UniProtKB/Swiss-Prot annotation:
InterPro entries: DNA-bd_dom_sf (IPR016177), Methyl_CpG_DNA-bd (IPR001739). GO terms for biological process: chromatin remodeling. A zinc finger (CW-type) spans 6-56. Residues 140-163 are annotated as: Disordered. This is Methyl-CpG-binding domain-containing protein 3. It comes from Arabidopsis thaliana (Mouse-ear cress). Disulfide bonds: none annotated.
């Protein structure tokens, strides 16, 4: 999961499969390691007895929650995966940036392909290591109110996985 306080996603969290508590993840690299293995190994925090690091508040005006697809590969060495939230706070744009000495931002797989063809140090990198799949925003999903009930209901876990 990604936590957004600004237009750039720079905070990361994961939910423990055992205790279901949300844990802050130290760095983007650590988060990508967890995310790349989610289909073969679920995240386990090893601190289940302790309180969670944060609570997912979907009604917050200052924080938005986004969820990545499972098993997106780790970003290749020499590149950085950049996630930018659009101004409407609903969708995320994914970019890759080359690191020093000159930063260059890539908006498509075609641009990345051209870049790795031109750079000797990236000759071992494959395009399967790059994913422009954007995280989806998590939000409460309200069920339609029937004529016999005036309360608003949510899905069982309160989270909509739909975009």
């Amino acid at each position: 999961m990604c936590v957004v306080k600004t237009t750039l996603i720079d905070s990361y969290a994961a939910q423990c499969w055992k205790c279901l508590k949300v844990r802050s993840i130290e760095s983007q690299e650590d988060y990508e390691e967890i995310r790349s293995k989610t289909l073969e190994k679920f995240f386990e925090c090893k601190r289940c007895e302790e309180p969670g690091d944060m609570v997912m508040n979907f009604d917050s005006l200052t924080m938005r929650w986004f969820q990545d697809e499972h098993s997106i590969p780790k970003t290749p060495q020499g590149l950085k995966r950049v996630l930018v939230v659009r101004t409407n706070c609903v969708k995320v744009d994914v970019y890759y940036e080359s690191l020093a000495p000159r930063r260059k931002r890539f908006k498509s797989i075609k641009e990345v392909a051209t870049f790795i063809e031109d750079k000797e140090e990236f000759k071992d990198m494959t395009l399967e290591e790059v994913s422009f799949a954007a995280p989806k925003r998590l939000k409460l999903k309200k069920k339609p109110v029937d004529s016999h009930s005036s309360s608003r209901n949510t899905e069982e876990d309160g989270v909509s996985r739909d975009a």
